[in-house]
Amino acid sequence: MRAELVSIPTETIPLDGLYYEPEGRAAGAALLFHGNTMNFYVGALRFLPPMLVKLGLACLAFNRRGHDILSTRNSRVPEGGAFQLAREGIEDNRSAARWMAERGFPHPVIIGHSNGGMLAVRHVADHPETPALALLSAHGGGRNIVQRGAQSGLMAGDRVEELAARARDMVKAGLGRELILMPGWWYAISAESFLDRMTETPDTLELAPKVRCPTLYIRGDREPRASYPAEDFGARAGGTCTVEIVADCDHFYNGREVVIQEIVSSWLSRMLHLQIAKS
């Protein structure tokens, strides 16, 4: 396996990532989309590529502009998930897909975790030639995403209306990139990002009928079905959908990484007629 740090340009900041290649000719490719406040070197984007490469797939795990919570690079200008916008996340995934196409892989498998899974559904709906989609605890998205998360103590908690009103006032005053502290994960968000999340987040279930390729949807048994609607997506999907509920498993697959590897790799090997290379 070979791995190369890469940088994909956008109209603002570049997308950093790690590109993996199998030894010899690749049988196909996969794009991996991370979840909220995460990045390409943690979670599923860290532990899946080695197994995907054994299937003969070239893989790109990359940061969207909305990675981590807050970060800087070669300046003191902040960036990261606190500033993310849905339209930028959608375009970042398209930029990564174009980057893969330039390397000879115009139709990669799409794999997304959590928020990356929701964005993966939007991407595949827009790219019907996608051969397969793997959703790892993809959330439901939609216009009630902030309220739904607040019921679990995330983000604004019981202060949704208060913080939304504050965010609207800040945007009107030209302070859209100023940060608001929240009582729950992810703890800090810009005013414009907060409002964008409330109104512009794609709806996973509304988009499901447009997904016609084979889909794998994984959810841990410790995750609420209402937030990660695997069965409902499967009922609405435009193509076949395999639902896997993993026992003793949280949202980040802690301690269950090998199980997730096995489920994803065996499903892809069946769907794409691939064989796992022996060590």
Could you tell me what each predicted segment is?
Residues 49-75:
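Conserved alpha/beta-hydrolase
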Residues 80-102:
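Alpha/beta-hydrolase active-site loop
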Residues 211, 217-219:
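Short beta-strand/loop motif that positions the catalytic acidic residue
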Residues 249-261:
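Catalytic histidine-centered segment of alpha/beta-hydrolase-like enzymes
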